[in-house]
């Protein structure tokens, strides 16, 4: 294991991070859309308001704060919710409180001390934590004397003996392990994207991992969600999503023995789209049509404008067959084969093309792809065949790779057979 994980602490990653402003569950969907556009990982933590009166000198402890955390709301959650028939009214839909949209799961965020070792933080994230809540403006001490801590760019020596020589335990992250003073309720929020960005800066310390292929590392996740291009796009949201929040849109190859990826329905792709237009498309189009048209044809137009110009006489029936922007010809639907989509590769390249890499791609290359595109994942295709999907690599897989012992690597000739979880009802 790289020493960088032992000698760095969570506080090192908070330098320059802004103070977190809580987003409450009573806020509207309209407010959530604005907040998500400025967020990391295409989602925002959602909180309940404090029920305890603000008494003089009262400071909320970590347990109380953890109970107020509801879950993380992302762009795909909002689009899927708005795709419901009763929500396709712009004025009404935008005023709905996010408490009706967010899926409760308060295990996705955890409050930690700035002195928490980076390796302990990575283990938490590997177990499902997506955000770390870190107190700001603290004066702290108490780590084991075996470590000199780099915090806010300065090396600090600990002045007290630790009660345990084994480092931080899982328990110690649930309560303050340091003597500290802090400004009341000032925190910053670290995401997995922040951690990957930090790791990019210390790649040399991780050698030889960064230049090792993802297939050799054995981190290609084959347990992904997918939907066939000829199925209604709304089917992609019928089942609970795993991490990452993404569904691959696939079509069979000519020999019908393999599937190739032509697009995706994901929080990353919907991050800064026109949410109402995307919701209409999700509710009314085939998956293949959706991945080609939602961004290029609709992102710059309002939902009401789309309805007025797409259907003669202001027709707003989502099943109308004479829509202009999403006609069968314009999106590549083959009229001679009503049960199958025939989509040329050139028609879905561009902004709606999925982010892909090869099984032979290095770990460093995949990390760089994710950061440069602000994506939560990269789809993996066969090394010798474009677009034939074998799996996905997300934040969880990368964190597993950088903390894995070299002896745990798998051979690079690993067989990739089978598929992920098909999303159909």
Swiss-Prot record:
SUPFAM superfamilies assigned: CBS-domain pair (SSF54631)
Keywords of this entry: CBS domain, Membrane, Repeat, Transmembrane, Transmembrane helix, Vacuole
Segments passing through the bilayer: 200-220, 275-295
Membrane topology designation: Multi-pass membrane protein
Residues covered by region (Disordered): 159-182
Compositional bias (Low complexity): 159-172
One protein family per Pfam: CBS
Biased segments, Polar residues type: 173-182
CBS domain span: 16-90, 347-409
Regions annotated as coiled coil: none
GO cellular component: nucleus; plant-type vacuole; vacuolar membrane
Subcellular location: Vacuole membrane
UniProt keyword Membrane, yes or no: yes
Domain of life: Eukaryota
Protein name: CBS domain-containing protein CBSX6
Source species: Arabidopsis thaliana
